[in-house]
Amino acid sequence: MSSLSTKTDLLGDPDFIRLQSVEVDGSEVIPGETRPRRNTKFPKLTNSPDGKTFTLYDVYRINKDSDSNFLGIRELLADGKRGDYKWISYKQACIRANNIGSALVQLGLNKGDRIGIFSINRPEWVLSDMAAMNHSLVPVALYATLGANAIEYVVNHSEISVLLCEGKNVEKILSMPGTTIKTIVSYDPLPQATLDKFKDNENVKLYLLSDFEKLGEQNPAQHEVPSPEDLCTLLYTSGSTGNPKGVMLTHTNMVSEVAGANFSPAGVIPEDVHMSYLPLAHSFERAVVSLMCYVGGQIGFFSGLIPELFNDIQVLRPTFLCGAPRVWQRLHDKLWFTVNNDSWLKKFLFNWGLNSKQSALRLGSTTPIWDKLVFSKTKDRLGGRVKFILSGSAPLDPKLAEFLRACFCCPVVSGYGLSENVGGASVAYPEDNNVGHVGPPLSACEMKLIDVPEMNYFSTDKPCPRGEVCIRGFNVFKGYFKDPEKTKEDLKEDGWFHTGDIGRWNENGTLSIIDRKKNIFKLSQGEYVAAEYLESVFVRSPFASQVFVYGDSLNSFLVGVVVPDFEVVQKLFASKYPELDVSNHATLAKSKELYKEILSSFDACAAEAKLHGFEKLKHIYVEHEPFTEENNLLTPSFKPKRPQLKERYQTIIDTLYAEYKRDHPDV
């Protein structure tokens, strides 16, 4: 196969790839901890991308006179379909943001006051954020899929008086008469029924955005320029327990993240195009959008429906893509589904090409002939211009990363971060052909590991230290809004943020996220179980789309809830079990055949991952309805809400345990 493979230099700086982070010179040796590590290329932490940009206000103003495309959305055609992207320039955006900001001042808002933004990603979201920066206001983002109770909590907790939102959310706010909101600005025209409700509402004033911009244009206000340490935004975490926490991020936090990303492999140039679909209420997407603003790139927004995302991608043709592992897993599954429905010859060529290319990539080679014969078509699924894929929010399966890298002809890098550090603390370098890690620290922060003895993770582990990941630097948050106790718990006086994630320093100075401190539980025999890791193993099954693993200290074994990948199931079962009605998901989920196939595939996954016996699922419930944000079982970053999952399936879990104990009295 040498004729199909060409050796190329993918290692960049070989010395750096061999050692990507180093211990901080002069740092104290503390028992139970590793010494702090920084990016080898940045022994001094950075808080600005250029030494003169220190606030998000500065970031938004850099390209204020540019006529280049900035914000784009697909035009809605007369027949209800979506057309091409329609753009506004940086100059146009700054003019509109000036008007919106002046109108906010006209309402009596002052520096430090909070405003709300309640919308899916769209140009008006960014314009509202820009307007807030012009006058040192503090935007508070509400998730489009938050429940009424959470929305009301965030609004009142942050004392929002003015809310800018898309039209469909206006009714939701009106149904909450006890909030602090005094003014609503709707991005969209409203039906007469909604307008009539405002006639009788003396407590809340309504503006349409077009009228609001005219108000500001007629009453221009001087900018109130923020300082680097001023509060820039409140990001309420989508956490899986209790009320959301308000993460206080300063301008220094936001801009140092721009610097860290700009100096990283995720750095972009003015010619780059970003597809914005991850929630702007999430710190990661805010950071990416801020980075694009800094370099003067283009930001295209999805049409609002995740099922249409890949159609939007093919129209926009972005130059890089960001997403969570669940997005990439679905892309993987859909591609395999297409391959398995092709002719035997195309299937044979795809498998041959995939195996050959993956082997070549591990050796630092490329396969131009295979790319032309097979993978040019798969690359076109993402628009044909994607130069790298960035995965975050959860660990990416190394096998999935290799698959994506081969099929889409670009590096696939994993990043790591939380809301408390603006979504990014580390990111892998595309020149590093190793997978299964999240790279070295960004230039804005340093990281260390501390012992977690109850899980047998120690900073003295050989050959690689392991422990809880702690982060300190310019991108680490100021604290939780109105919650000093939680702040003291997670953010120590010496500036170290304790993440609750378990990491491992690899020999080349990269970090791997291997576990989660807060999502472990002990079985009755004393064995600890890491639920998230096991879920990542079992979801490798071709039959599984989503998996919820459950265990507790009263039982010696695990049970689970599984949402099948019905596309795969229908294809395989149509020939193997012709007597089953594969078109009815609810009926199919109850079939013994599917139950047995899933458990059998889980056993294979467990064997491949070398799981212990107590880590295997003994009994499962097959659920035909997926876990989603809408049914409150997923966070906006696609992480499972474990307490809500437990509450929803508690009766089923109890039944699973009772049935298995009945049939296996010796457990």
Curated annotation (Swiss-Prot):
One of its GO terms (cellular component) is phagocytic vesicle. It catalyses: a long-chain fatty acid + ATP + CoA = a long-chain fatty acyl-CoA + AMP + diphosphate. It is found in: Endosome membrane. The keyword Nucleotide-binding applies. One of its GO terms (biological process) is long-chain fatty acid metabolic process. InterPro entries: AMP-binding_CS, AMP-dep_synth/lig_dom, ANL_N_sf, LC-FACS_euk. Long chain fatty acid acyl-CoA synthetases catalyze the formation of a thiester bond between a free fatty acid and coenzyme A during fatty acid metabolic process. May mediate fatty acid retrieval from the lumen of endosomes into the cytoplasm. This is Fatty acyl-CoA synthetase A. It comes from Dictyostelium discoideum. The gene is fcsA.
